[in-house]
Swiss-Prot record:
Disulfide bonds: none annotated. This is Probable thioesterase FGSG_00047. GO terms for molecular function: hydrolase activity. Residues 379-401 are annotated as: Disordered. InterPro entries: AB_hydrolase_fold, Thioesterase. GO terms for biological process: biosynthetic process. Belongs to the AMT4 thioesterase family. It comes from the Eukaryota. Its EC number is 3.1.-.-.
Length: 401
């Protein structure tokens, strides 16, 4: 795919950096110039602009069409691996739709590790489409068609609702399962199936401190304004209670938050660390013999030293010859059939490895953690006290643990 003028590199970092790239989607005005005001984030940061604003035209397919087009732009520079998404206002909604498109494809080589929403309001709290349609295109003579662009975008928002997170089908139950596919077994009669609704990426909400001035300014400008933006989560509690993992109040209102006297420090490396999936942990395990293990939440495959490959979230990660990594999705209830399946699998692994003691490490970003772990020659010489922790204790923990 040829380089598109709609995808702009805003910040560049060292080619050796393992920090996840951040893709920031335009706001209601279709512009990305405001993102150039952000502090250095020690990663590649890209901005995606709305090309339709140049001609003041609308996207016929609305937000879903925009998400698919923008995903193609992302794949052009990051065809596989983990990414972060984000954006101001409408950009947060498009980021969520992109994440949904990726999540629906179980074999997608891309994975969204987190989302940053900059004063993005849940769309059910916007004015209804009838009210938006009555707004005159009074700003049609605005610079570069920004006025009509915002009207088109508000109409799209008024008709869009985020879909529930996709249901995954996970097969478990075989320790000697030799299929090359992480999903479909060669002997399905020997496999049990678990269906679960996977959690969305951890999301940070940057919330403007002055919603009242936001509403007044929107109304005066003739745009659709949200009359419920005083809600603590800007309405996202109506989507999923576990969707927003952190709320950060920022100065100004939705229009002024990118003013020079406000913008410093809004998105920083510390903010990005908050996107750490707090319910995920990894365990580093040494095996003397080839082992294949299937857990009921994620397809987790430990492969023998000869192949030296592990499938994780359907991604392939190279590891050292005698170290494999287990990742357990802990963002689920601590009781019930699914967690019971996981506990039984953990117990089976402990039995298989004859009570192997395993240390547990916290993850910030998986890619960076893997790189650091694999390059750290001291990883095999971990503290002996940590090694005393029995593997059977590395079970599902509460989200707040």
């Amino acid at each position: 795919m040829e380089k598109s003028p709609d995808l702009v590199l805003i910040q560049a970092t060292s080619i050796r950096s393992s920090n996840l790239p951040l893709f920031l989607i335009h706001g209601d005005d279709g512009d990305i110039s405001k993102y150039f005001l952000l502090d250095p984030l020690d990663r590649n940061v890209y901005g995606i602009r709305n090309r339709c604003c140049d001609s003041a035209k609308a996207w016929p397919g609305g937000i879903p069409e925009m998400a698919k087009a923008y995903l193609d732009l992302i794949r052009a520079v990051k065809p596989r691996g983990e990414i972060l998404l984000g954006g101001w206002s409408l950009g947060g909604l498009i980021s969520l739709e992109i994440a949904l498109v990726i999540a629906r494809n179980q074999f997608s080589p891309l994975n969204v590790e987190g989302i940053i929403m900059i004063h993005t309001i849940f769309p059910s709290h916007q004015l209804r489409i009838e009210q938006v349609s009555k707004r005159p295109d009074s700003n049609a003579d605005s610079h570069n068609g920004v006025g009509p662009c915002m009207i088109h975008n508000q109409r799209m928002i008024a008709t869009w609702r985020p879909s529930p997170w996709p249901i995954r089908h996970i097969y478990t139950g075989l320790s000697d399962f030799e299929s090359e596919s992480p999903i479909v077994p060669q002997e399905p009669e020997r496999i049990s199936e678990i269906r679960y609704r996977q959690p969305p990426p951890p999301t940070i909400l940057l919330r403007a401190r002055h919603p009242a001035s936001l509403v007044a300014r929107c109304n005066n400008a003739g745009y659709c304004a949200d009359t419920h933006c005083h809600r603590p989560m800007l309405g996202w509690e109506s989507y999923r209670e576990d969707f927003i993992v952190s709320i950060i109040d920022i100065e100004g209102n939705c229009f002024s938050i990118f003013d020079n006297n406000y913008v410093e420090g809004y998105i920083s490396t510390d903010t990005l660390l908050d996107l750490h999936p707090i319910c995920n942990r990894i365990a580093v395990v040494q095996f003397d013999a080839p082992v294949r293990l299937y857990l009921g939440l994620l397809v987790i495959t430990l492969i023998d030293n000869k192949n030296n490959v592990m499938l994780f979230h359907y991604f392939t990660v190279r590891v050292n010859s005698d170290i494999c990594i287990i990742s357990i999705d802990l963002n689920l209830p601590s009781t019930g059939p699914i967690s019971q399946t996981v506990n039984s699998k953990l117990a089976a692994l402990a039995s298989t490895t004859q009570g192997l003691n395993v240390p547990v490490l916290d993850l910030i970003f998986p890619t960076a953690a893997y790189t650091q772990l694999m390059s750290d020659t001291g990883a095999r010489e971990m503290d002996q006290r940590k090694r005393q922790k029995d593997f059977t204790h590395t079970t599902i923990h509460d989200k707040n643990s």
